[in-house]
Design a protein with these regions (language model features):
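Bacterial N-terminal signal peptides that target proteins for export
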Residues: 1-11
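Bacterial N-terminal signal peptides
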Residues: 9-19
Length: 251
């Protein structure tokens, strides 16, 4: 039989084949370590590896060079990325909860809305990283070097112990390189001994944060909320902070 009726079997087969085709943009089986390494081995500067939407959770990828890979919407839950080279990677909308980035290099990464809750970034280099709307709640960035915009990020209860968020005097030819923490939620965060020199803390919420021995010299505190902070008497440079008179303290 010819005509539309004769075409039906072929149409059905085509529809079934299309429905069975894997959608790489959706959740799929986790990748194995050797699959990740093979993809990175094939990568070139012109064609970085593309792991968009893929699941790399739980893998041991410590020390691996990701060669500017695209990790958009990638799952990296509890992945070991200690000392990994993640410079210039894309982590936008990635989920990296409880991942280990200890001493990793994340310089110049693009990480809009990245989920880093409970992640470990101790001593990591996070220079010129875009962290708009990122979630760093309960993350550990102790000793990390952090420079770049993180407007509207969440960092409740995060650890920034002795972290360096201050202005970078060596790169001022590129414009002022510092942390832009406008409207960031630092409530309950531990900023003990942190370098916050010239950090933009405009409208940031530091309620209950520990600022013992933190350096706020030149930081912009316009509209910042500093209620119930700990260690106020030991804060360095508070008298030289910008707009400190317009910050909200208990008194």
């Amino acid at each position: 039989m010819t005509g539309r009726a004769g075409m039906l079997p072929g149409v059905v087969v085509a529809v079934l084949a299309a429905s069975a085709a894997p959608d790489l943009g959706r959740a799929q089986a986790p990748l194995a370590r050797d699959q990740v390494l093979a993809a990175l081995a094939r990568a070139t500067p012109q064609h970085p590896a593309d792991f968009t939407g893929m699941d790399l959770s739980g893998l041991d990828l410590a020390g691996i060079d990701f060669k500017r890979a695209n990790l958009t919407k990638c799952r990296l839950v509890r992945t070991n990325l200690a000392k990994a080279q993640l410079s210039s990677v894309t982590l936008t909308d990635a989920v990296a909860t409880e991942a280990d980035f200890t001493s990793a290099n994340l310089d110049v990464a693009v990480a809009y809305r990245v989920d880093l809750r409970r992640a470990v970034l101790r001593d990591a280099s996070v220079f010129a990283v875009i962290l708009y709307d990122a979630d760093l709640s309960d993350a550990d960035l102790s000793g990390a070097r952090l420079i770049g915009p993180m407007n509207n990020a969440k960092a409740q209860r995060a650890k920034f112990i002795r972290a360096n968020l201050g202005v970078d005097p060596g790169n001022q030819g590129m414009g002022i390189m510092r942390v832009d923490a406008i409207s960031v939620d630092f409530s309950g965060a531990d900023l003990t001994g942190a370098n916050l020199r010239k950090v933009l803390l405009v409208r940031a919420d530091l309620t209950g944060a520990d600022l013992t021995d933190a350096d706020l010299t030149g930081a912009d505190l316009l509209g910042a909320i500093l209620r119930n902070i700990r260690g106020r008497d030991s804060i360095r440079g508070l008298d030289r902070a910008v707009h400190a008179d317009q910050a909200v303290f208990n008194d």
